[in-house]
């Protein structure tokens, strides 16, 4: 990057499973840099590990301010409906506390056999297929949608429709503000309808637990509950699909590491930590607005400035990780921040780890000879949205 140029997001990504080279360039030469967004606005991007953690835990960087009606539409959908990523302080604490009542250790324990059954069914479908096949279509997408269906207590078809709206809304650089607004309106309407049904007829699912707890405690308004559930839907559908697919691509590209998991399932839990560090579901996240003048890494940010962090970049910082661009399923220590950091860290990290560990353990034991059916270098990126950095398809094969 020259001293006068401003990179435009989304950045080019020659290798779909790898972060954009632009992130490395910024991290090394301009760790707090201006970038141009699809909306045409300019925002700051923070890319180094310590600086990213600092921003994520600094109250002067406000999610709520980013969603205020007076703020420019740096990312249009942020202002369309409140969520956990657009509130701060006591309101955010109350929302997380309510969500934690649903995502408690007991719930995760009850979900473990459910997750195992979903994984087993998907792998049964894979075994019944004739290779080569698209792993994402047969395994990743069904698992992601069925996991969310169980959390919400709805049919997988409903989740598929929700996911379509999320995917379109996140593609602001491709479809324009008007379509983004329409998609978010449809998404909010669907979530509100589901919430009302759960209040009328609660079930044994996360959404019913949250809805009933909020009715008893009067912690949040219906609009705030909807916003919280939107966060769950956004992060809980597309992200697992991308992490499963990208993670498997990395394992099969480094076939010796896949074989380590085949030989010793006890290594899978640590491998999951490397998979989420190495295979991000996003390149930038956590839009915030600076509420007072602040200096980050020697760069002055004035009050009112929009700022993003890149956890993806932070997790490739050589000051934090030895050989950060090497994929190592036995990396130790591995103090990544793939699930975020500070007050807005992912509240479902324990549940996500359980799901990923269950999946990769089962996969490596049932398909020990799984391999890529086309060169790793030929993988194609799926879309150019703000959220997912997934692969279009992942063709795999195995001896029959």
UniProtKB/Swiss-Prot annotation:
Keyword terms: Cell membrane, Heme, Iron, Membrane, Metal-binding, Monooxygenase, Oxidoreductase, Transmembrane, Transmembrane helix
TM spans (from-to): 225-245, 294-314
Gene3D superfamilies linked to this entry: Cytochrome P450 (1.10.630.10)
Major location (coarse): membrane
Keyword field contains Transmembrane: yes
Gene Ontology, cellular component aspect: plasma membrane
Alphabetized Pfam families for the sequence: p450
Top enzyme category: oxidoreductase
Enzyme Commission number, as recorded: 1.14.-.-
Cofactor(s) needed for function: heme
Membrane topology field: Multi-pass membrane protein
Protein localization: Cell membrane
SUPFAM superfamilies: Cytochrome P450
Sites where the protein binds heme: 346
Similarity-based family: Belongs to the cytochrome P450 family.
The name this protein goes by in its record: Putative cytochrome P450 141
Species this chain originates from: Mycobacterium tuberculosis (strain CDC 1551 / Oshkosh)
Upper lineage: Bacteria, Bacillati, Actinomycetota, Actinomycetes, Mycobacteriales
Gene name in the database record: cyp141
